[in-house]
Amino acid sequence: MKKKVIDFIKENSMIKSGDKVLVALSGGPDSVCLLHILSELRELLHIEVYAAHVNHCLRGESALKDEAYVEELCKNLNIKCFVKRVDINKISEEQNISTEMAGREERYKFFEELKNEYSLDKIAIAHNANDQAETLIMRALRGTGIEGLVGIKPVRDGIFIRPILILRRKEIEEYCEINNLNPRIDETNLEEIYSRNKIRLKAIPFIEDNFNPDIVATLNRLAYSCSKDVEFIQEEVEKRFPKLCIKENHSILIKEEAFNEKEALLTRIIKKALFEVSSKHNNFELKHIQDIIALKDKGTGKQINITNGVIALNEYGDIRIKLVDSKKAKENKVLNLENIKDELDKNQKVVIEDDILGNYELIVEDLKKGEKFSKDRFIKSFDYDKISNIDIRFRQNGDKIIPLGMKSSKKLKDIFINNKIPKEERDFIPLVLFNNEIAWIVGSNVSETFKVTNKTKKVIKITFKGKEN
């Protein structure tokens, strides 16, 4: 089995002579097997091996036993072990993310700290062939493209390596037994409460029994095949990108001729352009790419907001992708109601258009008895007579609102957390203010102060039309 791992390491150029390799060590069978194999191969590969363990403080006594086990194991193998305790529940609550996500972020943060402090070259993660199969099934069920079917990569960013991705879970368990390693077992892995656990414990055994007894190997071959196709496609993108795109003024101009390319190439060129202008890659979706393709046919000057301050602008058939300057993005866009009072009284309608904050339609009308208001979260009505001026802007430090039905104010930050609005989106949600007080978090909460009551005579209905002009 060691030869199998050595061959896999060499095939994927994971390790070179003299490398310092840090093993992410949970204490479970996979990471223990990985650590033991690399410790056995130290002299052959001419490498130094270290280990890092993060105690998430989630499983009480069991977590402490895991910690003690990895320290003893590393001592026996003469491997330096770094241990860190983190209150994952606390971090999860503070950041409004799952414990699983919080745990992953803290682990990788710890690995990065150790890498920098000790000049480590590689970080070895103990994913195996079964993990790969589970990942492909999960992604297929959620919906994915060919890139998603590549699954877990043997090497990522030239730093993160997965030397036992070639091994089946059964092989790993047998290795641990033969070498009397007695790894720790995380009991939560046996509970059918997570999607991955259900796939591991139910779906894969069912497929093996009824359709394909070698489904794990089959899915790993699929991942390998897709990885080769993606490599080829990406090479073509890298060749064509400099000819079809121009980098200028902190933006990317996609030439009109790029839109004549095959869709498989065009979508990836657009994706690369988005990645070039923004570091928040995980927020770009297929819909954003499709919107950019559609923008090409909407005429010069037309613009759409993508996400995280990234906008796309049609410039005579070319499409410019750029990140809106943060100062400009947060600049207050003020509309003083007194200046448009005559227009509202005459036409009962005013349209506001703004490149950054979006487009709005304001309609003033008499309140009809028994009138039912729209349930659309982008259409809200307020008491017109309570309003003297209107501001529309993005959030600022210390912003508060008195939510509908409440008597006291609440911080916008807390509302965003309660509404599970991602951090990266919060700075780009428009706010409508009346009399310098927040009346509406567009798409979300409205204020108690300006609500329509039985004493209301006139209402102002505001419709958010989106951020395309």
From Swiss-Prot:
TM ranges: none
UniProt key word Cell membrane: no
Catalytic function, reaction form: cytidine(34) in tRNA(Ile2) + L-lysine + ATP = lysidine(34) in tRNA(Ile2) + AMP + diphosphate + H(+)
SUPFAM superfamilies: Adenine nucleotide alpha hydrolases-like, MesJ substrate recognition domain-like, PheT/TilS domain
Binding site for ATP: 26-31
Cellular component terms (Gene Ontology): cytoplasm
GO biological process: tRNA modification
Compartment(s) of residence: Cytoplasm
EC number: 6.3.4.19
Molecular function GO terms recorded: ATP binding; tRNA(Ile)-lysidine synthase activity
Main location per the UniProt record: cytoplasm
Keywords assigned: ATP-binding, Cytoplasm, Ligase, Nucleotide-binding, tRNA processing
Domain notes: The N-terminal region contains the highly conserved SGGXDS motif, predicted to be a P-loop motif involved in ATP binding.
Role description: Ligates lysine onto the cytidine present at position 34 of the AUA codon-specific tRNA(Ile) that contains the anticodon CAU, in an ATP-dependent manner. Cytidine is converted to lysidine, thus changing the amino acid specificity of the tRNA from methionine to isoleucine.
Protein family according to the UniProt entry: Belongs to the tRNA(Ile)-lysidine synthase family.
Name of the protein described by the UniProt record: tRNA(Ile)-lysidine synthase
Provenance organism: Clostridium perfringens (strain 13 / Type A)
Lineage: Bacteria, Bacillati, Bacillota, Clostridia, Eubacteriales
Gene for this chain: tilS
